Amino acid sequence: MGYIGAHGVAALKKHKYSGVDHSYLAKYVLQPFWNRFVKIFPLWMPPNMITLMGFMFLLTSALLGYIYSPKLDSPPPRWVHFAHGLLLFLYQTFDAVDGKQARRTNSSSPLGELFDHGCDALGCALETMAYGSTAMCGRDTFWFWVISAVPFFGATWEHYFTNTLTLPVVNGPTEGLALIYCGHFFTAIVGAEWWAQPFGKSIPLFSWVPFLNEMQMSRIILFSMIFFAVIPTLAINTSNVYKVVHSRNGSMLLALAMLYPLVTLIAGVLIWDYLSPIDLIRNYPHLVVLGTGLAFGFLVGRMILAHLCDEPKGLKTNMCMSLLYLPFALANALTARLNDGVPLVDEFWVLLGYCIFTLSLYAHFATSVIHEITTALGIYCFRITRKEA
């Protein structure tokens, strides 16, 4: 069974991307650089290839983090931090110029939008792993993934209802990534231990502040992001969706229902970690973030496809396919509570199965949708020339 019906094909042919970026950093600093940088690519270079190259930078960064900090709680060599920063900067640059290349070559398409944002969704997990090694976050790495994934999903959800992707004056793809790669470069100078020690020791000027002075520096960053970035962003997303739904006499309950799969996914993984006898997130942070990141990529991709195909607003039931593995994982972890701490199946293999399941789900979705869109529009994914009629 395909993902796109006859109505979806007709909507794809009419779709036009709409996006607004209010960032001053992008407007006055990065955009002029990107406008020059895109010219290094030949006109035969397909935009999706540039997107894929940018994605590979993040994949390389995540692999470096795994090699030199398997549990994300030990300091890697300082050159690794510099590599993380450089690779993230290159990812941001390639992610910004793929759309410019599409306009240069007159090859813009709904597939490009889906491919771009789909890679960005997976990139949340990959960059979280890289940052986890830089800041020695350990099990907190999962929470850093949450605070990157939730605003991303909120922006995608808002885009689905408003038909315009609006980036505020301070936003994640611009200022957020810039802060992160500057953090990587900074860590290459001071060392990863700077993030793992108490706030008062890392910044002696504020050692007099009660409670905070004993908190780990990386957790200060985590809580600051939650209160000053994630919560305000979600409030704006929800407000904008409410305005659109109210103006169309729609149901806000149906709109909020689209958030159910992500909330359930995060809650399910946290409950699994709580029940597990081996402390999943601490011992296997890469696998937990990778498996959950792939499930998240499927959720984002499915919502973007619903937007491109002008599907009715509301929960897409097949989004819940990303949750199918969790009942088995939870049941297996629960058997350990009933069997003296020994689960029915070793938790490592259950976690590995989770990653294989979500990878298979995402791969099937991605390959199927790419095939259906290229067939419907008569285009190629990695070639600029159109298919012969």
UniProtKB/Swiss-Prot annotation:
Keywords: Lipid biosynthesis, Lipid metabolism, Magnesium, Manganese, Membrane, Metal-binding, Phospholipid biosynthesis, Phospholipid metabolism, Transferase, Transmembrane, Transmembrane helix
InterPro entries to which the protein is assigned, alphabetical: CDP-OH_P_trans, CDP-OH_PTrfase_TM_dom, CDP_ALCOHOL_P_TRANSF_CS, CHOPT
Any Pfam family: CDP-OH_P_transf
GO MF, one example: metal ion binding
Principal subcellular localisation of the protein: membrane
Cited PROSITE patterns: CDP_ALCOHOL_P_TRANSF
The keyword Chaperone is assigned to this record: no
Cofactor needs: Mg(2+); Mn(2+)
Keyword Lipid biosynthesis: yes
Enzyme class: transferase
Membrane topology recorded in Swiss-Prot or TrEMBL: Multi-pass membrane protein
Subcellular location(s) of the protein: Membrane
Family: Belongs to the CDP-alcohol phosphatidyltransferase class-I family.
Name of the protein in its database record: Choline/ethanolaminephosphotransferase 2
Organism: Arabidopsis thaliana
The encoding gene: AAPT2
